[in-house]
Amino acid sequence: MIKLKSILNFLYNITNRDGFKGYKECNAAAYKNVCNDSSTKSTSKLALIISYTQNLLSFKNIIGLMLIIFAGILFYAYILQHEWQYVTLSDEQVKKYRISEKKALSLYQLMKDTHELLTKNNIKYWIESGTLLGAVRHQGIIPFDDDLDIGIMHEDEIHLQQILPQFEQLGYRVKHNKIYVICGERCLDIFLFHKEKDKFIHVIYDKYPNDFFYDHELYPLKKYKFGSIEVYGPSDPIGNLNRQYPEWDKYAIIYSPHSLHLPFLSNIEKKSKFILTPELLKPAQPLGPLEDRVNLF
């Protein structure tokens, strides 16, 4: 019969030694102790082989499998970094990506309130980034976008600060950390721009180096159709859009709200381009009804 003490020593050494070195040492020690019992030599060898195999499969193979999976993810991310995936979505698939009617209404209402408050207080603004893309390409909110972006000149920051309480009176929350964020059910980001040489750039330009305007691109501001309302935007948006969103007039990029946010996976979602179809070109719905809240002040 296999010695109980030898088996216990074998298990103790496995759980208390580091890595495969400790594993091999304890296995050798157990093998020596067990096999010295001549009366049970053949039985002990079989038991030892079974035990060794089970432990090898349950530890080494699990580690190996994890490494294979990790390597596969890295390879997939690498491929997507170097090659775009072009996908055509059916109308039914597009509908799955669309924001809800409640979100769409809250975004249009937020844009309407912001436009009226800033205009009423003589603060010049323009739609920016994805909001600008939505106005140019969809004549409204991009159907799978979930926030709003506008820009103002830094000279108007003090005037903006003076009217922030009016946003709060409308039930919005106001936050500030480099950019101003106006939040209800959805949020609107206000970027502060300044002129540097021949460019208008904003305070987090280092993070978005392609988001700038040349003087002739920005001024004079003009109006854009945005759902059921009108908003102000740059004079010539094409240069800015081409820099930020190459092939924006042919393809859409849909970002998943369920991202794992892992650095090596950051390009997986960004590298899928969806061919623009009539359904994808429709703005977020519904466009209204919207309330006239600012005029109540």
From Swiss-Prot:
Residues 9-55 form the RPE1 insert domain. The chain crosses the membrane at residues 62-82. The keyword Transferase applies. It is a single-pass membrane protein. GO terms for cellular component: membrane. Keywords: Membrane, Transferase, Transmembrane, Transmembrane helix. It is found in: Membrane. The keyword Cytoplasm does not apply. GO terms for molecular function: transferase activity. GO terms for biological process: glycoprotein metabolic process. NCBIfam families: RPE1. Belongs to the LicD transferase family. This is Uncharacterized protein RP688.
